[in-house]
Swiss-Prot record:
Pathway: One-carbon metabolism; tetrahydrofolate interconversion. Functions outside the photorespiratory pathway in catalyzing the interconversion of serine and glycine with the conversion of tetrahydrofolate (THF) into 5,10-methylene-THF. This is Serine hydroxymethyltransferase 2, mitochondrial. Methotrexate binds at E104, T184, D185, T186, K414. Its EC number is 2.1.2.1. One of its GO terms (biological process) is glycine metabolic process. Its cofactor is pyridoxal 5'-phosphate. Belongs to the SHMT family. It catalyses: (6R)-5,10-methylene-5,6,7,8-tetrahydrofolate + glycine + H2O = (6S)-5,6,7,8-tetrahydrofolate + L-serine. Pemetrexed binds at S82, Y102, E104, Y112, S148, G149, S150, H177, S232, H260, G331, R430. InterPro entries: PyrdxlP-dep_Trfase (IPR015424), PyrdxlP-dep_Trfase_major (IPR015421), PyrdxlP-dep_Trfase_small (IPR015422), Ser_HO-MeTrfase (IPR001085), Ser_HO-MeTrfase-like (IPR049943), Ser_HO-MeTrfase_PLP_BS (IPR019798), SHMT-like_dom (IPR039429). Ubiquitous. Mainly expressed in the shoot apical meristem and roots. Also detected in the leaf vasculature, especially in the protoxylem and adjacent cell layers. It is found in: Mitochondrion.
Length: 517
């Protein structure tokens, strides 16, 4: 490099004159410079104008898609238990200037300058997270940078386990989640099962409850380093104390994944996992009703006094923080963290407690009405925000019913139930009460929702009976071509929409909507 620089310098004999001493040339350059400056100023004003223009003006196509989604949310039944309607104040924070800042690192230790207010927002979010779940900050810490629930779980695994160490979690067809390490006999579906060895525990298929006795026996043989207590389609409460005992025997970490139920836990209407777990993860957009993000809570401080009488401290904090950044993420989403801080403040209010109480009452009434109509619920009922309907006794599956539900403006999702062999054509439908409760639905409304669901299932059975083949595509073809059945679906859709339109919108006003019919 030095030789190259010497050659370059020796080749330059004298300075190059950019301007002639000729006066005419100077006047020409001066006028050119003035013209260029004027053009630059004009260009600058154009992009600033563009940056400050509204969405309707800049991109009417995207604006129209958003308006269509508003109409869908207003006119339909949102029954997917992992969904909710977040508040206007949260959306204002998420759509704020906090999205503009890069802030790799943690408060007080960033790799970028200009983060004094980002630090304030993240620190406030952490403080409110601990307060929302009534945690002692000397015994618990929290990372609020994780982007979503699945990454949060993977970050915990990579922080606390070595590659190919062992994880036990609830089996996906029995109500578990992909991020807990799902695999089939022939394929590792989740990346977790690629990098770690995973083994499921399951429900007792006779009762629909987790088989804790078998879990304990399996743990003795498998010797897991971490056991997950958490689910995505389990309608009953976890026995955290029982899993804690199993973890103690195996010297395993207990990870509670409360993604679905964290809002209920924050409100104190169901038992908290924090008394028993070492680490707790949650998404923030389900029952918690915040923006789309995640949190990782971890124990810190004194763990135990060992046999030598020495204090042993928890070491989760540094390991988890390093797994999040720089291990698996770069810059955090500061707009999401700011919106989460707002949601966590709401979680400490009397209104929030009343809302979560109503979520449980609504789900209980929903389950009661479905049972009265002859539906089979996995575990026979519910203790939380969701019901899992096993449709096998009705002679139909979740995929076919889901297709009809969508056409009549009821959003629910097909779901595996114990005994299923296909995740694409499962035997169940999963439904929950958080979203519609946010819109003001109470018990009598969910009794009505159950009636509309029952009508949709009956239509699905008629379509199945008229289908020429046994495949899902044959069902869809009949659904799209049979005019009589289409008329029935149209009538049911009108009934659903008229009922749903009575209730308030969340996050936007009806008067501002483009599509009101």
């Amino acid at each position: 490099m030095a030789l190259a620089l010497r050659r370059l310098s020796s080749s330059v004999k004298k300075p190059i004159s950019l301007l002639s001493s000729n006066g005419g040339s100077l006047r020409f350059m001066s006028s050119l410079s003035t013209a260029a400056m004027a053009e630059s100023e004009k260009s600058r004003s154009s992009w600033i104008k563009q940056l400050n223009a509204s969405l309707d003006e800049i991109d009417p196509e995207v604006a129209d898609i958003i308006e269509l989604e508003k109409a869908r949310q207003w006119k339909g039944f949102e029954l997917i238990p992992s969904e909710n309607f977040t508040s206007l104040s949260v959306m204002q924070a998420v759509g704020s200037v906090m999205t503009n800042k890069y802030s790799e690192g943690y408060p007080g230790a960033r790799y970028y300058g200009g983060n004094e207010y980002i630090d304030m927002a993240e620190t406030l979010c952490q403080k409110r997270a601990l307060e929302a779940f009534q945690l002692d900050p000397s015994k618990w810490g929290v990372n609020v940078q994780s982007l979503s629930g699945s990454p949060a779980n993977f970050q915990v695994y990579t922080a606390l386990l070595k590659p190919h160490e062992r994880i036990m979690a609830l089996d996906l067809p029995h109500g578990g989640h992909l991020s807990h390490g799902y695999q089939t006999d022939t394929k590792k579906i989740s990346a977790v099962s690629i990098f770690f060895e995973t083994m499921p525990y399951r429900l007792d298929e006779n009762t629909g409850y987790i088989d804790y006795d078998q879990l304990e026996k399996s743990a003795v043989l498998f010797r897991p380093k971490l056991i997950v207590a958490g689910a995505s389609a389990y309608a009953r409460l976890y026995d955290y104390a029982r899993i804690r005992k199993v973890c103690n025997k195996q010297k395993a970490v207990m990870l509670a994944d409360m993604a679905h139920i964290s809002g209920l836990v924050a409100a104190g209407v169901i038992p908290s996992p924090f008394e028993y777990a070492d680490v707790v993860t949650t998404t923030t957009h389900k029952s918690l009703r915040g923006p789309r993000g995640a949190m990782i809570f971890f124990r810190k401080g004194l763990k135990e006094i060992n046999k030598q009488g020495k204090e042993v401290m928890y070491d989760y904090e540094d390991r988890i923080n390093q797994a999040v950044f720089p291990g698996l993420q770069g810059g955090p989403h500061n707009h999401t963290i700011t919106g989460l801080a707002v949601a966590l403040k709401q979680a400490r209010t009397p209104e929030y407690k009343a809302y979560q109480d109503q979520v449980l009452r609504n789900c209980s009434k929903f389950a009661e009405t479905l049972l009265a109509k002859g539906y089979d619920l996995v575990s026979g009922g519910t203790d939380n925000h969701l019901v899992l309907v096993n449709l096998k006794n009705k002679g139909i599956d979740g995929s076919r019913v889901e297709k009809v539900l969508e056409l009549v403006h009821i959003a629910a999702n097909k779901n595996t139930v114990p005994g299923d062999v296909s995740a694409m054509v499962p035997g169940g439908i999963r439904m929950g009460t958080p979203a519609l409760t946010s819109r003001g639905f109470i018990e009598e409304d969910f009794a009505k929702v159950a009636e509309y669901f029952d009508l949709a299932v009956k239509i699905a059975l008629k379509i199945k009976a008229e289908s020429q083949g046994t495949k899902l595509k044959d069902f869809v073809a009949t659904m799209q071509s049979n005019e009589k059945l289409q008329s029935e679906m149209s009538k049911l859709r009108e009934m659903v929409e008229e009922y749903a339109k009575q209730f308030p919108t969340i996050g936007f006003e009806k008067e501002t909507m483009r599509y009101k019919e």
